[in-house]
């Protein structure tokens, strides 16, 4: 059984009538009036099969698609003058510099806090709604922030390959072991002294939180950022214990009438 291949006729750019005949092979054409070589038809056995791709010949390698080029690293020509970060667009740099300038143009409608970025405000508002969209895959607990979930997942770690040489505790990461030894076992565990009192602290964040005790409380209506505000007079404090001391010492007479 022979396959019938249709005959195609078209005109070339030089206005010559070209006829494609079957059996001439690729790249060979028959002009009208030319003699067509005769060859016996090959017997067809079984269905047509595609050539094997396991061992491609020179023609197959030539027709293979080129490999995709590796994408070059993104260009970040806009560098922050206050830190080492760089950005691709000026708008990204302008948004980043809000963190250095202390500007917080995104206030929370439910509390006096304000934030530099809309994403920080959106994450903060989850604390007011009570939503916990980040569940733990190992226990029923859920968290409002991914960072809280990441900190909680350490409790489910199967191994703790970094033991403390001074106590039976062990840790999942070397950074946690270093922080533990710095806090509990170092002789100079408090290298950050307070400039206003004899106290000293292990970490700069602890010192910064303590220095709020020496700063005067913000007046009512002030734009200064404070975490704990008195509901009676409007004064704000950096720590909750200072707010409780203020309420016991200033508003106990008014509410209970124990003093003149």
Curated annotation (Swiss-Prot):
One GO location term (cellular component): nucleus
Lineage: superkingdom: Eukaryota
Any one GO molecular-function label of the UniProt entry: RNA polymerase II cis-regulatory region sequence-specific DNA binding
Keyword Zinc belongs to the record: yes
Annotated Basic residues bias: 67-78
Keyword line: DNA-binding, Metal-binding, Nucleus, Repeat, Transcription, Transcription regulation, Zinc, Zinc-finger
Bias (Low complexity) ranges: 51-64
InterPro entries recorded: Znf_C2H2_sf (IPR036236), Znf_C2H2_type (IPR013087)
Region Disordered, annotated ranges: 22-81
Signal peptide: none
Zinc finger intervals, C2H2-type: 78-100, 106-128, 134-156, 162-184, 192-214, 228-255
Record Pfam families: zf-C2H2 (PF00096)
Subcellular compartments: Nucleus
SUPFAM superfamilies to which the protein is assigned, alphabetical: beta-beta-alpha zinc fingers
Cited function: May be involved in transcriptional regulation.
Classification via PANTHER family: ZINC FINGER AND SCAN DOMAIN-CONTAINING (PTHR23226), ZINC FINGER PROTEIN 575 (PTHR23226:SF206)
Protein's name according to its UniProt entry: Zinc finger protein 575
Organism of origin: Macaca fascicularis (Crab-eating macaque)
Native organism taxonomy: Eukaryota, Metazoa, Chordata, Craniata, Vertebrata
Gene: ZNF575
């Amino acid at each position: 059984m022979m396959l019938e291949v249709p005959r195609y006729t078209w005109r070339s750019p030089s206005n010559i009538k070209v006829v494609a005949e079957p059996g001439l092979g690729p790249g060979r054409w028959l002009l009208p009036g030319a003699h067509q070589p005769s060859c016996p038809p090959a017997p067809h056995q079984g269905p047509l099969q595609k050539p094997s791709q396991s061992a491609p010949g020179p023609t197959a390698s030539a027709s293979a698609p080129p490999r995709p080029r590796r994408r070059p690293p993104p260009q970040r020509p806009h560098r922050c003058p206050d830190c080492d970060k760089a950005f691709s667009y000026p708008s990204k740099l302008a948004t980043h510099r809000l963190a250095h300038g202390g500007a917080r143009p995104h206030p929370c409608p439910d509390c006096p806090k304000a934030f530099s970025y809309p994403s920080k405000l959106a994450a903060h508002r989850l604390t007011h709604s009570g939503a916990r969209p980040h569940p733990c895959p190992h226990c029923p607990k859920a968290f409002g922030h991914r960072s809280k979930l990441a900190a909680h997942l350490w409790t489910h770690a199967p191994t703790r390959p970094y033991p403390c040489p001074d106590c039976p505790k062990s840790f999942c990461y070397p950074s946690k072991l270093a922080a533990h030894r710095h806090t509990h076992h170092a002789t100079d565990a408090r290298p950050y002294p307070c400039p206003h009192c004899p106290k000293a602290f292990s970490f700069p964040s602890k010192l910064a939180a303590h220095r709020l005790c020496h700063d005067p409380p913000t007046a009512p209506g002030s734009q200064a950022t404070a975490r704990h505000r008195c509901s009676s007079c409007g004064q704000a404090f950096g720590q909750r214990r200072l707010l409780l001391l203020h309420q016991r010492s200033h508003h106990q007479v008014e509410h209970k009438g124990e003093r003149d």
